[in-house]
């Protein structure tokens, strides 16, 4: 078609074709980047929140959603039962205690958290200085908190815990972590679980709760239902009832924001599909109008409307495919550059991450390509009908 025509028609259609391909490519690049960034945000934010906590917590039913928790007795039999829940990869006891760090120049409210083992992997990944705590008087704090309090590795500080009386503990900083999640970095210090149990006045298996990690986030509520079935009618040794809560229930504002992000992605993809579709429709109409004489001649020689429409639809398929190839090449290249080099920074206090995160899953990428191709071809059916309106007699008479 446009690449085989000679003379004036060739020069008229070629710019229109280039614009159509460019419009398709730009639209696909925007859709690809939008999808990759949205998936990256969700993945990074979820990973950080779960790293500080877990997918599912089992706590005392009488808790009031604070870090000053009532204890449960997390028996070995309960731990063993929870370990057999489908999709559960780790079951750990944990303890938390609110306190206040006081230095010569400043003070800051904190939560000291002790857990058995799975948290070490997360904080070791985000360790920027020093090492993980090993003794009861050693703690890990964030570099953000260290900057606020003017502390550094190997410094010692007093932390005050207020119950019926005020108790002071002196801790040594063994290392600094940095997750770039400022809300939690300023709040949590990581210590020894036995030390936190002692601060709470508990012993043995008395803990704040049990944390469960899953292998698949999409199975969150299915796993939570199974955990509830095990714990709901199973009081502990002191008669306490259990309460099961998910990470989404513990962080409703953040996960509502992530769901709003999904809506934004849908809106952007729809807008870009409209823009790309408009470019392709315009390009196809120009190609058809530029080929009126050829269409009239082909009809005069016996070509049917169906045959000619299929010819132009094949041409549209070629143009869409070329635009998508360029869009994939440029879009994936930009994604890889951002993924490895973090070219575009962000304010972590506002966006919870310090750079634009990228996560492009193969399944999502394939679906985006297939969906874009099918929808683009679907909108081409309308303008291709122009072929059937062209009369050979009128074209020949005009000629």
Residue locations for each model-derived region?
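Short helix-loop junctions at transmembrane helix boundaries
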Residues: 310, 325-370, 381-389
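Short acidic/glycine-enriched loop/turn elements at secondary-structure junctions
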Residues: 80-91, 96-172, 195-200
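Peri-transmembrane interface segments
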Residues: 10-18, 223-226, 230-278, 287-289
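N-terminal Sec/SRP start-transfer signal
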Residues: 1-28, 399
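Hydrophobic, regular-secondary-structure patches
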Residues: 29, 36-111, 135
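Basic-flanked hydrophobic alpha-helices used for secretion and membrane insertion
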Residues: 151-238
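A hydrophobic alpha-helix feature that marks transmembrane segments and, especially
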Residues: 32-40, 262-300, 308-311, 383-384
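Transmembrane alpha-helical interface segments in multi-pass membrane proteins
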Residues: 285, 292-339
